[in-house]
């Protein structure tokens, strides 16, 4: 295949970043020199589409055949949903068809994209990612202080939340802690989750299950087309290790088994 013949000459480095959009953008800001040529992945795809249909693009075929050099190409997590499935399966071929790239930055690649990269590079890939706050007794104290400032009342509930989270400080618990917050509207359930998430370094990942009453819920939880949103994609892109599944009781009970396995 084409990339196996000249891959090392076409892309100097590949960096796979796993984590949130915020952290990915911060990583790029710290690592991309301002004087270098950087293009987004979708600009590369536009060039690829023009080469497939030169008569429609209005660009001369000779110009389309030239290999262009760029210092950096950035593939964001949202880009995969904007291309056809064959682009993911032939990712390396398509990326290198018209471009010679210094550094290819890839955020949260789908399995097919990662396999394409690993096959071409024989595992020679740099892996970076978001780092999450480790829960310690000191962090628990900070969480409690912030909860006390952000949520009025509910003193007993706050203590129960901290008690439930304490076992994560021992380092012996392999699964996430699941806390059920229940009560009428306006008592601080969502605000408590938001406060904890901010104390742990980022915005809350909130999954609104009351909006999922049809096949949409099944596709979101178990996965569907790459262009559709999914629980797995949202979890990989989270900013903190706090996930709020809001109005869990309003989803079809058939989905409960999936979460019993997960948690």
Tell me what each language-model feature is.
Residues 2-41, 175-207:
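Walker A/P-loop
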Residues 2-6, 21-23, 28-69, 79-88:
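A short, well-structured beta->alpha microelement
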Residues 6-9, 57-69, 93-101, 170-174, ...:
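Conserved catalytic network of the ASCE P-loop NTPase/AAA+ motor domain
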Residues 47-48, 199-227:
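AAA+/P-loop NTPase substrate/partner-engagement loops
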Residues 57-88, 239-263:
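Conserved AAA+/SF3 P-loop NTPase catalytic/coupling segment centered on the Walker-B
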Residues 76-84, 91-122:
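Sensor-1/coupling segment of RecA-like P-loop NTPase cores
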Residues 111-148:
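Conserved ASCE P-loop NTPase core motifs with emphasis on AAA+ ATPases
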Residues 137-178:
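Pre-Walker A (pre-P-loop) alpha-helix and adjacent loop at the N terminus of AAA/AAA+ ATPase modules
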